[in-house]
């Protein structure tokens, strides 16, 4: 892509990098005026990422691998940094990995935010991050063959069926609070559970001294599916299904990545329609989480009332696109359907109704003593931990960091829509609740402005051609935080590589630090304050480090204890 050098962002940072590490950069390629990919010497990879992260206000939203043996004879690892200092831009640090040794130096000891990404690269490509502190599998199940790595370009034998797992547990849960704790294996998952996760809380009496958890029980292989079986616009509809609530955010991030790779100019009206639907999703998600927060503190009247008002956000979606879920609207280059005058007027009426309803509910919520008593000082995300791990969304804004892609890297129509960035410094559950409360009102204001100021332009840019192996990032500030996608186009009308990173993926690593020092009854509230993008937790193993005893407890029992705070499951 040809980029006008006079408008390029990040040049001062790149100049400082070259001064700090002479000869480290091997190649530099611009994708957009605010996106650049630099290839560095592999031995300097940790130093370069560490320098950009800590010396230039970088954050690490996503890292990923790529099998580029057919392109350059190597594997590659990419570390995408969002630079959020004085000069806001994206710098993607790339290193080529030898195809025979498959080794590269781990960045995690220098930048802890890299830990999950490097574990996933190890699983999916068989690359070896030398020095990675946590060598456990992240994505692949225990019975997956050691020599089969799903995202390599090698042919896979899909007829393979792994051997049944044994009764012996092979995944080592880590307890940093007390290494002498005795752990008992947990039974199988409930077959009726959606998106289960397994938590282990290490406790001393009622106090949590540490926590560990395992997820990815229902990994769907969407990236592999997109690369092998779907055309470019078909992936748009697949990305809609990444999340049950913020699917539209993912489809915007995906289409944005392809549009950035090809330099496609999206019509302004399409940008505005995308922004409107993104804020409808934010209303839906935030009202749902506020309702669940009421439930977790035992305020079920508030739970039911928030869910009642939330229905209006789904009615908005149905008015605007014909479905209560915001599916099927995006295409590469724009959108498929317009918002007509009658739809716009009815939506504006709903916005006014919701503003009055939410105002009344928030006043009731904040007047409920149980809310402040149960949420203030609970589940604190320390600022230093937040800085090291790059969490996102209301979680990071509740710890005082002003991070929001709508402000840092405006996309769609967010450069034109008036908006306010809300932060709270408490770092606790209450701060995260208040971020969502403020953002709910701001979303209503943004919807009102966007619906009243829709430009008169076409909806879709057509007639462009796909360029093999062009690549770029796409991103969206979804309700839970930033969704970041990276797409590399192929030469067969399919993607060569698609990396889709949902917001919750960035938030899970800090959860154990938020649970430490709190009580077992607070665990559901703390976990819920992440607004985690999964439906339920299978069960929890409680390990009493003082008595050297452990007990497996159904999650519903922990949830019940968190609400009424009597009849402890530990007794």
Map each language-model feature to its residues.
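Terminal low-complexity/charged segments
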Residues: 1-210, 371-373, 387, 443, ...
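Metal/cofactor-centered catalytic core regions of large enzymes
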Residues: 42-45, 112, 138-571
């Amino acid at each position: 892509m040809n980029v006008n050098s006079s408008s390029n962002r990040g040049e001062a940072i790149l100049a400082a990098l070259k001064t700090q590490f002479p000869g480290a950069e091997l190649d530099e390629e611009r994708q957009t005026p605010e996106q650049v990919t630099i290839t560095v010497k592999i031995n300097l990879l940790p130093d370069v990422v560490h320098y950009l992260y800590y010396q230039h206000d970088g954050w690490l939203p996503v890292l990923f691998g790529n099998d580029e043996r057919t392109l350059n004879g190597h594997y590659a690892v990419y570390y995408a940094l969002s630079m959020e200092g004085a000069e806001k831009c994206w710098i993607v640090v790339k290193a080529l990995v030898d195809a025979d040794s498959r080794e590269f130096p781990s960045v995690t000891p220098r930048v802890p935010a890299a830990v999950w990404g490097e574990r996933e690269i190890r699983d999916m490509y068989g690359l070896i991050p030398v020095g990675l502190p946590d060598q456990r599998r992240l994505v692949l199940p225990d019975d997956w063959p050691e020599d089969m790595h799903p995202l390599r370009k090698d042919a896979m034998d899909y007829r393979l069926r792994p051997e049944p797992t044994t009764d012996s547990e092979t995944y080592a849960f880590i307890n940093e609070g007390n290494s002498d704790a005795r752990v008992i294996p947990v039974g199988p998952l409930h077959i009726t559970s959606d998106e289960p996760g397994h938590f282990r809380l290490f406790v001393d009496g009622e106090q949590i001294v540490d926590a560990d958890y395992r997820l990815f029980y229902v990994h769907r292989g969407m990236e592999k599916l997109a690369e092998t079986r779907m055309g470019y616009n078909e992936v748009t509809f697949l990305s809609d299904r990444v999340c049950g609530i913020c699917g539209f955010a993912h489809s915007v991030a995906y289409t944005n990545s392809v549009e950035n790779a090809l330099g496609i100019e999206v019509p302004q009206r399409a940008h505005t329609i995308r922004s409107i639907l993104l804020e409808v999703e934010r209303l839906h998600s935030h009202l749902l989480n506020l309702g669940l927060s009421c439930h977790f503190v035992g305020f079920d009247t508030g739970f039911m009332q928030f869910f009642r008002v939330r229905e209006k956000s789904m009615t908005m979606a149905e008015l605007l696109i014909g479905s209560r879920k915001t599916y099927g609207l995006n295409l590469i280059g724009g959108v498929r359907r317009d918002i007509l005058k009658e739809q716009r007027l009815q939506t504006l009426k709903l916005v006014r109704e919701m503003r009055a309803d939410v105002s009344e509910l928030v006043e009731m919520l904040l007047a409920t003593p149980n809310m402040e008593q149960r949420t203030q000082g609970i589940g604190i995300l320390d600022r230093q931990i937040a800085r090291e791990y790059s969490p996102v969304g209301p979680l990071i804004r509740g710890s005082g960091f002003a991070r929001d892609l709508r402000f840092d890297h405006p996309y769609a129509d967010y450069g034109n829509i008036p908006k306010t960035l809300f932060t709270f410094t408490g770092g606790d559950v209450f701060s995260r609740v208040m971020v969502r409360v403020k953002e709910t009102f701001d979303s209503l204001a943004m919807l009102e402005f966007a619906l009243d100021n829709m430009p008169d332009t076409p909806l879709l840019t057509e007639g462009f051609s796909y360029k093999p192996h062009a690549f770029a990032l796409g991103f969206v500030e979804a309700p839970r935080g930033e969704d970041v996608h990276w797409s590399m186009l192929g030469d067969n009308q399919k993607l060569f590589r698609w990396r889709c990173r949902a917001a919750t993926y960035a938030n899970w690593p800090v959860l154990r630090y938020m649970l430490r020092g709190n009580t077992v009854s607070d665990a559901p509230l703390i976990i819920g304050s992440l607004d985690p993008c999964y439906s339920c937790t299978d069960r929890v193993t409680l390990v009493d480090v003082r008595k050297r005893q452990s007990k497996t407890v159904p999650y519903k029992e922990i949830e019940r204890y968190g609400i009424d705070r009597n009849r402890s499951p530990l007794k």
